[in-house]
Amino acid sequence: MNELESFSPRHEGHHHAANIKYGYIVLGFSVVHIIGILICKSVFKLRWTTSTKGIDFVKSPLFISIIAWTLILIGLGVFHVQLPENYVTSIKRFGRMSYALLPFDIFLVLRPNSIGLRYLELMDLHKWMSRVIIAGAIIHGVGYFIKWILEGSLFTKSVRLWNFLGIVVFMLNLILIIISLRYFRRRIYQYFYVVHNITVWLFVGLICLHARPGVGKYAIACASLLGLQIFERYAKSHSISDLKVISYEGSNLIVVRIQRDSKIADWPSGSHIRLTYPLTNYRSWIFPTHPYTIASLESDEMLDLIISKSNRFILHPQMPYSWTGPFTSFSKELLQTIDNVDIICGGSGISFALPVFRNLKQKASHVKLIWCVRSNNDLHVLRTLNFNEEIIIHITGNLQDSTSNTIFDEEDYGLLDYDNNENFELESLPSSETPSRTVNDDSLSQDTRPKKESKFIIVQGRPDFGNTFESLVQVNSSNKWIIACGPRSLVNSAQEWASENKVNFVSEIYEM
């Protein structure tokens, strides 16, 4: 017998070992779920055509998966249990089933994913599975608190070492639930990230000691997956010693240029890297890495990033950094078959839009790029990247304004969490009734005189989707798309319009 599973029983009751099989049942359902995800991906590839109605064509909706798991755990939790007489058996079972789900939950966020999926595809499932796991653990903990209170033994039972280890994890889970709320997460993201990962590691380690019968097999699986993630990060990290930061007075956007390493594999358009401190710096292991979309194509000599200035992670040209990736963000099948496309982006979302636009420009029948920014000073990124294609630019602040206010920087996910930031340039704009003023600009100056030779079409005011996407709607084809990249508010507005006008839609969300 595994040493970790040989602890003598410390919870009373003759049903001590009755729940062991339920952990294996949950583990089995986890394997079935992974197989189901793979089947969906295979069917998606086989059935993908130019007339497909979108990426979610064969994917099961997230809420169905979560409801299914919730019903499975509740059903197994009370199955063959005479309530309320044997409720202790039930609360023990919820604790074991929660722990048995941990390997599956960690597996969902491996980077790169070992089953060939983009890890971002599984991030929402990971977040909700984490909530299901915590819910089961809380049922287990609250159940025992009630039992001990009724017995009058709350203090004596709580201070016992093995019980106390479980209480520590219980309290960490409660703290994590509170600070994971959007209000707190957006304001203290780094601390949320640290607490999140500490909770994961202690959940794996302390519950291995707390649980009886033992859960050694699950603990080994979890530790192996976490160890694999650390090894992958160490083995596949790239060092940076000559990072170049290009800024412009009055702009909140900066361009970061990294010399491309010849060993770096090609990446599909829209891919991203994760930038952090050197691996020898403790901060690279404690705090979250920072994901930035690659604004250049795989054929370019430089690896360019367009990012918002941040007080959380300030880049200095003379300092060393490290990064991992590139990680794919966009469906290869979609890029190969998509046609008739309007791309709309906000702020630093242009970093996602530019390479996708350049890629589609070579093969799509119709491609249009729309960019929303608060200040015309942000246009310096186009000049820096030598972008000379036609683009419609909406200046949503005062045309004469030299500042570009951004309330939140674009943070994202870490080892076991996916989060980014909400920074929508259109949120504080005039109403849609505000008249737009169109200006052609070639020199990025504030000269409002039309210049026919210019490819930058500048419009003051927020975009009117009806006018913006008018040419796309008129295309006589079912293979027409809107790609939105930026904050959730922009993406949701574009998605709603696309749905109402029967246009296919795909997005990249920047939010926290």
Curated annotation (Swiss-Prot):
InterPro entries xref list: FAD-bd_8, FAD-bd_FR_type, Fe3_Rdtase_TM_dom, Fe_red_NAD-bd_6, FNR_nucleotide-bd, RBOH/FRE
Q: Which UniProt keywords apply?
A: Electron transport, FAD, Flavoprotein, Ion transport, Membrane, NADP, Oxidoreductase, Transmembrane, Transmembrane helix, Transport
For membrane topology, the record states: Multi-pass membrane protein
Q: Where is the composition biased (Low complexity)?
A: 427-436
Q: What is its EC number?
A: 1.16.1.-
Main location per the UniProt record: membrane
Polar residues composition-biased segments: 437-447
One GO cellular-component annotation of the UniProt record comes to:
plasma membrane
Subcellular location per the Swiss-Prot or TrEMBL entry: Membrane
Molecular function GO labels: ferric-chelate reductase activity; superoxide-generating NAD(P)H oxidase activity
Q: What residue ranges are annotated as transmembrane?
A: 20-40, 61-81, 97-117, 132-152, 161-181, 191-211, 218-235
Which residue intervals make up region (Disordered)? 427-451
Q: Which Gene3D superfamilies match?
A: Nucleotide-binding domain of ferredoxin-NADP reductase (FNR) module
Enumerate the spans annotated as Ferric oxidoreductase domain: 94-206
The FAD-binding FR-type domain is annotated at 230-355
- Which GO biological process entries does UniProt record here? apoptotic process; reductive iron assimilation; regulation of actin cytoskeleton organization
- Which Pfam families does the record cross-reference, listed alphabetically? FAD_binding_8, Ferric_reduct, NAD_binding_6
Q: Which PANTHER family match?
A: METALLOREDUCTASE AIM14-RELATED (PTHR11972:SF198), NADPH OXIDASE (PTHR11972)
Instruction: Identify its protein family.
Output: Belongs to the ferric reductase (FRE) family. AIM14 subfamily.
The protein's name in its UniProt record: Probable metalloreductase AIM14
Species: Debaryomyces hansenii (strain ATCC 36239 / CBS 767 / BCRC 21394 / JCM 1990 / NBRC 0083 / IGC 2968)
Lineage at the top is: Eukaryota, Fungi, Dikarya, Ascomycota, Saccharomycotina
